[in-house]
């Protein structure tokens, strides 16, 4: 049986992602430079599509970093007519960084920022949620 060429598969999947806003590209470049793990454009676009398909209005994200995945979810929520994406991160500087990116993208108005331990923030935030995205260890 032939081996899977993962780079060919990855390149194909990347080719399916529509052009991204300059701010998202800036976030991707920052992540690469700092070696900060993000979901990347293929997974981001997939999350966006899932949120759009189910008409998600309430999304809770556990472990949001500097807001890359939040940006994809917030885009979907905006296009779904509004709602809220809960961004959680334990570091206030990272939360401020995320707020800056999401403001630049015009999506901050649908994001609630939590500077807290993610699971505890989830416990304290009333649901229901259409999506709970777990991006923590």
Regions found by a protein language model. Name each.
Residues 1-25, 29:
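N-terminal auxiliary segments of SAM/dcSAM-dependent transferases
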Residues 7, 32-33, 112, 116:
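A generic, residue-level signal for flexible/boundary positions that often mark functional hotspots
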Residues 9-12, 31-33, 85-87, 104-106:
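N-terminal start-of-chain detector that recognizes signal peptides
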Residues 15-16, 35-36, 62, 87:
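A generic structural signal for short
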Residues 17-19, 32-45:
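Conserved SAM-binding loop and adjacent beta-strand
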Residues 29-31, 56:
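Glycine/charged-rich beta-loop-alpha catalytic/anionic-binding loops adjacent to active sites
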Residues 41-137:
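S-adenosylmethionine/decaboxylated-SAM
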């Amino acid at each position: 049986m032939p081996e899977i060429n993962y780079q060919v598969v990855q390149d194909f999947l990347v080719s399916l992602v529509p052009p991204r806003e300059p701010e998202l590209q800036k976030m991707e470049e920052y992540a690469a430079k700092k070696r900060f793990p993000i979901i990347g454009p293929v997974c981001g676009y997939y999350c966006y599509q899932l949120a759009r398909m189910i008409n998600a209005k309430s999304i809770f994200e556990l472990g949001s970093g500097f807001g890359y995945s939040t940006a994809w979810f917030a885009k979907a929520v905006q296009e779904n007519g509004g709602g809220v994406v809960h961004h959680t991160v334990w570091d206030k500087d990272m939360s401020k960084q995320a707020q800056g990116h999401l403001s630049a993208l015009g999506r901050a108005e649908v994001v609630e920022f939590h500077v807290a331990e993610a699971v505890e923030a989830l416990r304290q935030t009333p649901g229901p949620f259409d999506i709970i995205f777990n991006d923590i260890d």
